[in-house]
Amino acid sequence: MEKNRERKYQKSEKKHFCSKVILLLLIIPFFRPDFISEMSDSSWINIIFVIWRMTAFFFILGKYGIDFLKNPELDRNFIVIVIYEIILLYSSIYNQEMIKERLIDIANFLGIYFIYISYGKQQPKLFIKVNFQFFSFLVWTNAVLTVIFPHGLNRAVDNSARVNFLGKDNTITLIFILTIVFCALYHNIFPRNPAPFLTTVVICTLQFYYMSGSGIVVTVVLILYLCFVSDWNWINRLLNGNLMFMIYMILEVMIVFLNHIEFLNPLFFWLNKASTFTDRRYYWDTAIYQFLDSPFWGQGNGITYLWNNNYYSHNSFLDILLKGGIAGTVLWCVMVLYLINRVKLKKNLRVKGFIVCCFFCFLLTGLMEGLEDRIAFNAFLSVLPVLNRMEETEMLRNKLINSGSQIKKHAKPVIKYSK
């Protein structure tokens, strides 16, 4: 009897270890550290990651298809994403622009969606644990290398050109926000573990060191929420995706389309970023002018042609307007709002409020950078549909990173899950 029990335990442990390794091997190629492409675009390492990502995509596509055949269930999230991607692909074909790049972006989005939706529903504890450990490893590695190479791995003279382990200062924020999301989810499973808090502290420290304008604003917003208002239920009820998206659009219109930034001058002065916003105006004005040439379908790519060179528009909304025009932009807004509104979490108001706060932080970063083709943002969107399932299985305890180790008395007992 004891031998049979021990064999079952060993078999369970082996199965758990194999699942963990497979999930890790699927995730890694989608989050390749950006320094690889920034510093050695044609290196053999980059080629390995491309092949690895393709293999991971076809593997998870097959798994998703097999799971669907076993349990045919209409995946509305997948349908919304596919409709949006079809419109952008049509825009690229219509304009004969960057068709290959569009197909790669589609594969990246669908690949990470299949991974997150499959493991997030079937093995939620393993899913949270592996993602937290993986992103924490990236963050801590980035921190150590920043201490060793304070001017970046490329030893840049200008901070804006500094290349860190996870990428440049102005794009690394997206990975940091996604990591903090998994810190909060991990804390719900292991409330006494200090690792989520320590990782969050490292992220905040790095953000203030890098002095990226959007990164500092996002960090301040998250600190204010976690430290001061996360316990207020009326705030968490007030926080919803539609309201945050509306505020984001107001900022887009005021800052980008009307170029009225005077009311934010004190903030820009404090961040020492007034010149940065002045430079952004050239990108924004050029992007708006190009968008008006083909307003409905866009130009098929997000490039602005300025000073005889190709530049990024440095704004998420203008980026999608250029790529897909009005048609693509409307569907992008519908997709984003549909996915964020899928999060109910009636028994976990604090977790829901925090997720919406992180959603707003992504949008704030989108004022200065693109979001549509960023794997970190698409991964965040892919997490949203599985949160309700986690609540149904009582995986969530309505706890955040700043919570103590004590579980409140009125909280329901949590069922212990196997690894």
Sequence positions of predicted segments:
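Loop-to-helix entry and N-terminal half of a specific, functionally important transmembrane alpha helix
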Residues: 21-28, 343-369, 383-388
